[in-house]
């Protein structure tokens, strides 16, 4: 059944601000640094554009990372901004790496997931709070398929979309086994262990997969328990991503917040700080990793055998 809901103003706005496919965190880092260098040189966007013979909108779009920057154009900007040769070489190297590092094409083609996945692929560590479902990086194929099928009941999509979505989810999980692997810390509400997606066999395999993942040195799983005096928190799912410094160009932490429209990113330091504090408290109030593994084993044995 095809949805006949009208396109919302928010949908139209999201379409206008979609970055080019292939966008990476390295590219965002480069875009932010180009703006900083221009401002340090005392130039407005219009002035910089006039000096290199471009339109003012091109400078703006590069700095907002709506378009990429060619190496020849980058050299022009760095020369205009008076960047010394050593740092110029580092920024050119960053630009090359940003172009080379990409998700598999099937992931890049699925834009609603791709922007988040690009950030996730370049993150050094991710802190993830999940009150409703098993975190995507730890889902089995059958569990992921069951989750997506429920979503499709509410928001029908084209044929084959569920399988493409599951395939992208599995591609994302490669960050856990790369060298060096992503450092993943998750807090999962205990209700997730009891909430059924698929049949009992799907749930049993999913919880067994969680138990195995919890043994890996780069993965920490904590369960936010139902028992005790802890409140039911009005905090939706979010991921807090931290990135390594590359070529002396830092990138602020990014928070990806989930809602019905997909994921939206927060980069303002005051906003991301609140989510950092929230995750630290969620982790502190949760069971420790050993207790969490025991609870997962109990939920597997008692609920899904």
Map each language-model feature to its residues:
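Interdomain hinge/linker segments and adjacent boundary elements that couple functional modules
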Residues: 2-32, 36, 40, 45-50, ...
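C-terminal regulatory/effector modules of DNA-binding transcriptional regulators
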Residues: 199-305
